[in-house]
Amino acid sequence: MIRPEKMTIKTQEALAGAQQLAARQGNGSIEPEHLLVSLLEQEGGLIAPIIQKVGGAPAALRSAADVLVKRLPQVSGATAQAYLSPALNRILDAAQREADTMKDEFVSTEHLLLGFFADRQCAAARALLDAGVSRDNVLAALMEIRGGERVTDQNPEDTYQALAKYARDLTDLARQGKLDPVIGRDDEIRRVLQVLSRRTKNNPVLIGEPGVGKTAIVEGLAQRIVSGDVPETLKDKRLVALDMGALIAGAKYRGEFEERLKAVIREVAKSEGKVILFIDELHTLVGAGAAEGAMDASNMLKPALARGELHCIGATTLNEYRKYIEKDAALERRFQQVYTGEPSVEDTIAILRGLKEKYENYHGIRIKDSAIIAAATLSDRYITDRFLPDKAIDLIDEAASRLRIEIDSMPTEIDEVERRIIQLEIEKQALLRESQDPHSLERLKKLADELEELKAKSAELKGHWQREKDIIGRVSSLRQRLEEKREEAKKAEREGNLARTAEIRYGEIPAIEKEIADRSAELEDIRKEGKMLPEEVDGELVAEIVSRWTGIPVSRMMEGEADKLVHMEDRLITRVVGQDEALVLVANAIRRARSGLSDPNRPIGSFLFLGPTGVGKTETAKALAEFLFNDDQAIVRIDMSEYQEKHTVARLIGAPPGYVGYEEGGQLTEAVRRRPYSIVLFDEIEKAHPEVFNVLLQVLDDGRLTDGQGRTVDFRNTVIIMTSNLGSQWIQQYGSSDYARMKAMVTETLKEGFKPEFLNRIDEIVIYHALPLEQIKKIVDIQVECLKQRLADRRIVLELSDKAREYLSREGYDPAYGARPLKRTIQRKIQDPLALALLEGKFQEGDTVRVDLSVSGEELVITKK
């Protein structure tokens, strides 16, 4: 009998499983048949793969073994534990002898399988032989799987066929045509080939920003190896990608991870240069598997890399390379850096054109060239925190996905007709209950006619939609077949089967292409009656996706929006009174940006609003936010009175490394990162510390700002508004009497308050005039309108007489303080007495409240009309 400590974990599990099966079936002894069933149903076991390798069918063998178990005698009412039968003891002894013969330290499941053949009279052994499993072919399969390895620990299965378990064969995937085509990147691939062909330190590491195509370069290399487009030294090599997740997952005990990694290194070394190992996210090696006193993965790889036994390609980002690899000089020197830069917009367009067919076939739609150009150019300009070509590919993918969902959904025209039918059916049922009424009968007849008409229309539309959908689906499946045939032709050509290659290329492919053309022509004929389903991704759809991602309106303007922008000043004047010059300057900047004529490397507009308090500087920013975003609170508002100290600059852009709050980011930079298209208002800018202006210089000039964490924040889609009271004394003193002198005095005051390099970067310095009495009357109307809206929620109507309006204008007018005293006057004279009257119950819902001037002309009277 084998001692338990001399069994592998899988052997112990198999025997325990056999014991449980015997107990469940009510058998008095544990037989070889129980053990065979237990071995076949083991997860991650070696027996099922061995049987498959020798040509047997594990599922059929399992069924046969189940039948044998059911035939075993059952004992009812027995409580004693089942014992090992003599037949099973003989198999276990034979397994021990097999382990000794193979010089293995532990009895493994494969030894148990060989043990079955020692007792040919055993029913389980006969079942194995009937399934085509013999001792000789099991030994041959075992040699192939184990590769001459001995069982030296209790978990040997983890180390068998390590590459098959813990790596993906990229060359095999390339042969099957499962990798996306790699366009361009010839310089980087050539550089990788040069490093791989070196005698020593032939391990390139691809370094670049996330999304620039590092993994794609390795996939391109795999495709080149398959097509033979590589130097002689690299021909017929296997490129396998190590799966770190699979390597670490399930390694419960100390040393298991190291065993697995050693097995991978051994298998690569044994291939004598035939296998090139690709480790994506190379930095994950540093610290992987390190526990108390254990080595991490990178230290285990170093000796093999240094000796040249391990051919390896790494890939990692710049930040992670600096953070993990550069700190370990011994690991860094074993790799040769290959820098991978971000491709240009032109290169990205070429890459997208190469990938176009793959995405068309997957989504079953067509992608226009205008969509590809839009994806590359718009993602480059508006999605600044990611890199080409990844962000452009994502745009195309999402646009295609959205179109596919539209094709699969019911068109709006049919949906509207169906809803109308349901509505009329409900109405019909209601009228049927009142069938005695002659008017109801007449209405019923009309309803029946309308329903019949609508149902006929619905059936016609559905038929048209279904025909379109069927043809689009058929064309999609034909395109997929075409791609499969092209891959088959490439495979046949590689294998030297030229007859099959010619048959596919000159027979099958042209036939499929002809059918695609016929179906497309049929679709065009159907669409002459009317197009119901979109089928092409165009530039406009891509622009819409960009708008959804960023909140920046880059899609083509609808007629309504264009008209809105043309009359932008008229809309703003309804909120900001008496400052026409300021509104025209702001409107021009927005129009330039939306028509695509503004400088792409600067903010949409940067303005310095000057003027006395209460004349509408901050209100202009709010009115602009309401115009652009339909929400006057959609402003990144920074009150500069909070930034009077030098150290408060850190609050704007984020604390530097080592300081508290480093992870949180800055108030300005974080707000703009989240909403790249916004209005940034720096209120009362003259109150800020001079250091703050130095931070704003690069925002105003280059439309960018680097935050405390080194990230570049894009300000090119923001409107920057700064307000200040500097020079307001001159504006009030000279006002409209001497505009030229007033402007000269204000400019002098500005030069004293701000540095010339700051003033020189501002697009427009806008001077707000003090408000005359006539303008205050207009503001009364605006303020009272707000009050009317609040009362309308309570269904109370407010009316204001002309005399009351004149009175409020006079009382609320103060040239020194602008419109703010007016707000306080309305609060004091109307809101306070009205609030008291409402609480006393003098006014109810549905009442009309009239505000008039008293006979004395000294106060307002509020009465019910």
Curated annotation (Swiss-Prot):
One of its GO terms (cellular component) is cytoplasm. Residues 7-72 are annotated as: Repeat 1. Pfam families: AAA (PF00004), AAA_2 (PF07724), AAA_lid_9 (PF17871), Clp_N (PF02861), ClpB_D2-small (PF10431). Residues 561-770 are annotated as: NBD2. This is Chaperone protein ClpB. Belongs to the ClpA/ClpB family. Part of a stress-induced multi-chaperone system, it is involved in the recovery of the cell from heat-induced damage, in cooperation with DnaK, DnaJ and GrpE. Acts before DnaK, in the processing of protein aggregates. Protein binding stimulates the ATPase activity; ATP hydrolysis unfolds the denatured protein aggregates, which probably helps expose new hydrophobic binding sites on the surface of ClpB-bound aggregates, contributing to the solubilization and refolding of denatured protein aggregates by DnaK. Residues 161-342 are annotated as: NBD1. Homohexamer. The oligomerization is ATP-dependent.
